[in-house]
Swiss-Prot record:
InterPro entries xref list: Ribosomal_L11_MeTrfase_PrmA (IPR050078), Ribosomal_PrmA_MeTrfase (IPR004498), SAM-dependent_MTases_sf (IPR029063)
Keywords, sorted A to Z: Cytoplasm, Methyltransferase, S-adenosyl-L-methionine, Transferase
Catalytic activity as recorded in UniProt: L-lysyl-[protein] + 3 S-adenosyl-L-methionine = N(6),N(6),N(6)-trimethyl-L-lysyl-[protein] + 3 S-adenosyl-L-homocysteine + 3 H(+)
Protein name, UniProt field: Ribosomal protein L11 methyltransferase
Amino acid sequence: MVSSWWEIQVVGDAALEEGISWRLQSFGCQGTASQKQNHDCHMTGYLPQKQVNHLDLAALSLWLAQDAIALGFLPPTTRWKLINEEDWATSWQQYWHPQEVGDRLLIYPAWLDLPEHCERLLLRLDPGVAFGTGTHPTTQLCLEALEMHLDQTFGPVEQVTVADIGCGTGILSIAALRLGAKQAFAVDLDPLAVESADRSRDLNEIPPEQMIVQQGSVEQVPHPVQGIVCNILAETIIDLIPTLATISQPHTWAAFSGILVTQAKSVVDALEQQGWQVGSLWQRQDWCCINAHRL
C-alpha cells in the first residue's frame, strides 16, 4: 500500500525563518527545506498522514500566526496537501540549491550535474527529508569553524584526525577531509544517520578507511584525535563533555554547535570545568558555535 504524506508550505517574512523552522520541527516534520524570495521565506516540511489530522494542521497554522504577531510581523500563509510517498521522496528537492559556506566550501545537491569549473571544495549531499541540507545556521557555523581550525592547526593538516560526534549526513566529516584532514570518525546513535553518512561518503568518493562511519558515540573513536566537531543539542553536549577526555589530548580543538545563544553559558561552564579553554563564540541568528581547545 502506498503511504501518503502531508506537505506543509509556509510563506512568511524572511525574519521569521528560524521560528517557522522550529515550529515545523516541533510539530513533527521530518526535515524542512527553505528558499528565500525577495523579503519572504518559503518553508516546506513533511510528515506522515497518519501522524496528524486537519485539526492539528489548523492548530499549526494558528501557532505560526501567533508567533509572527508576537514579533510584530504579519501572519505567514500556511497551506497543506497530501502527496504519495514517491512524490514526497523528491518534491522537497526543488527548494534546495547549491550553497556557498565560508571561504572554500560549496554544498552541492547530488542530483545536479557537477559544475565544469569550480574553485570551491564540493560537498555533495543527498540527505532525504529526514536530515538537514546543510543550510541550518549551526551546520554552517561548524563548517566555518572547521575551515578556521584546519587552517590554524598545529603541524601538518595531513596528519589531523577528526571526530564527528552526532554526524547526521556526515557533512562535517566530509568537509574536514576535503579541507585536508587525514581521517574522520563519524559516529551517530541513530542507525538512519549512519546509513545516510555511508551514502554521503560513497557519493563523495571517499575511501571507507578514511571516513569511518559507526553507530554509537564517543566510545567508537579508537584513539585521541586532533579535532572534534559536535553539532547536536546543548543538553547532550553537556552530558558528553566529560567523556571527551578519552578522545582528546593537549591542544585538541573542538567546535560545538546546535546551541542556542541562551544556552551558551551552561556549555561554556561545563567545558571549563573539564579542562577546556573557550577561544571564541560565534553567533548566527539565535544559534551559536563555541570554539575551544583542550589545555
